[in-house]
Curated annotation (Swiss-Prot):
The lineage of its organism: Bacteria, Pseudomonadati, Thermodesulfobacteriota, Desulfuromonadia, Geobacterales. NDH-1 shuttles electrons from NADH, via FMN and iron-sulfur (Fe-S) centers, to quinones in the respiratory chain. The immediate electron acceptor for the enzyme in this species is believed to be ubiquinone. Couples the redox reaction to proton translocation (for every two electrons transferred, four hydrogen ions are translocated across the cytoplasmic membrane), and thus conserves the redox energy in a proton gradient. It comes from Geobacter sulfurreducens (strain ATCC 51573 / DSM 12127 / PCA). Disulfide bonds: none annotated. It catalyses: a quinone + NADH + 5 H(+)(in) = a quinol + NAD(+) + 4 H(+)(out). This is NADH-quinone oxidoreductase subunit K 2.
Length: 102
């Protein structure tokens, strides 16, 4: 069964909107902020893979693999910073990161 490209784009748009809402509503909680960013990146990957399947080219799939690699690096660094902040300040509030500048 082949899924129409329009349905893939609609799903990608809904996922992106859901991630954007997550980022905007819970922007002070760093863990929810990371989850929202991940959902938005997954929506972009879905659109790339859907476009690659639609036009029969592998460029979108290759770009999705690159996004996955960058996302894993981003998550590992951000999670390390969140763990550090939680150990030091006992909170995951984004305002606490501003005090660590220096």
């Amino acid at each position: 069964m082949i899924v129409p490209f329009e349905h893939v784009l609609i799903l990608a748009g809904l996922l992106f909107a859901l991630g954007l809402v997550c980022v905007l509503v819970w922007r002070m909680n760093l863990i929810m902020l990371l989850i929202g960013i991940e959902v938005m990146l997954n929506a972009a990957m879905l659109a790339f893979v859907g476009g690659a399947a639609r036009w029969g080219m592998a460029d979108g799939q290759v770009f999705s693999l690159i996004i996955m690699a960058l996302t894993s690096a981003e998550v590992s660094l951000a999670l390390a910073m969140v763990v550090y902040l939680h150990r030091r300040k006992k909170t995951v509030d984004a305002d606490e990161f501003r005090e660590l500048q220096g």
